[in-house]
């Protein structure tokens, strides 16, 4: 049955307008983006099939162009559109974070880092550079790694802190495996960075590890 034949209250677009985007499932939100179905399937049917094929929204958003275009009814134009929407979402969160006078709690930082790092297929190490009032100066990806890890060099981190004239820093990296639990190596490199920055009176406020739908804060665990 075509979506146009559904009751108005069940059509994704009408449902969003009436009840807000939070009321829609992943498939319904994706269907609005897709706009049309194909080969006898409605946009919602196609969206459900895509989510099933990729194993969920996270994997779909993280897919490269080749993998994405193998999906039924999808091509480069849809891939470009989806990446543009994803990037706008990241930038929106980034602007929101920058406009805060200071960080009220770690949750807003986790939300931002989730948006920036969760969908990456390889591990990256990043930092939020802050002024003396804990306002954001810059968010930088410092090191890129493989699926297994990213090499982190304290000397380069120090250079970045000085370049931004940062008074404090929050480190972050992702675990492409989806498991956010920090490793012993994560704790060791954090200790090394803390010691290096202490010599310059730069505070390490937190190190957040981003997994799939979860983020672990070193500060919340009392490790800093």
Swiss-Prot record:
A Pfam family matched in the record: UPF0758_N
Family stated for the protein in its record: Belongs to the UPF0758 family.
SUPFAM superfamilies, per the entry: JAB1/MPN domain, RuvA domain 2-like
Protein name: UPF0758 protein TERTU_0184
Native organism: Teredinibacter turnerae (strain ATCC 39867 / T7901)
CDD domains in UniProt: MPN_DUF2466
UniProt keyword Protein transport, yes or no: no
GO annotation, biological process: proteolysis
Positions occupied by motif JAMM motif: 173-186
Coiled coil (UniProt feature): none
Domain MPN: from-to ranges: 102-224
Binding site for Zn(2+): 173, 175, 186
Keywords: Hydrolase, Metal-binding, Metalloprotease, Protease, Zinc
Presence of keyword Protease: yes
InterPro entries in the cross-refs: MPN, RadC_JAB, RuvA_2-like, UPF0758, UPF0758_CS, UPF0758_N
GO molecular function: metal ion binding; metallopeptidase activity
């Amino acid at each position: 049955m075509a979506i146009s034949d559904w009751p108005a209250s069940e059509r994704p677009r009408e449902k969003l307008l009436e009840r807000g985007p939070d009321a829609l499932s992943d498939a319904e939100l994706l269907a609005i983006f897709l706009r049309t179905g194909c080969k006898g399937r409605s946009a919602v049917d196609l969206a459900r099939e895509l989510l099933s094929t990729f194993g969920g929204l996270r994997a779909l958003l993280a897919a490269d162009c080749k993998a994405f275009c193998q999906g039924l009814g999808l091509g480069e134009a849809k891939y470009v559109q989806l990446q543009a929407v994803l990037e706008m979402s990241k930038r929106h969160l980034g602007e929101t974070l920058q406009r805060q006078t200071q960080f009220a709690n770690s949750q807003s930082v986790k939300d931002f880092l989730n948006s920036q790092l969760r969908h990456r297929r390889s591990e990256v190490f990043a930092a939020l550079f802050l002024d003396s009032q804990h306002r954001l100066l810059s968010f930088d990806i410092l090191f890129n790694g493989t699926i297994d890890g990213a090499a982190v060099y304290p000397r380069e981190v120090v250079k970045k802190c000085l370049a931004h004239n940062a008074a404090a820093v929050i480190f972050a990296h992702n675990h492409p495996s989806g498991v956010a639990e920090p490793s012993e190596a994560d704790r060791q490199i954090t200790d090394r960075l803390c010691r290096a920055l202490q010599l310059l009176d730069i505070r390490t406020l937190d190190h957040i590890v981003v997994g799939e739908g979860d983020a672990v804060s070193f500060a919340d665990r009392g490790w800093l």
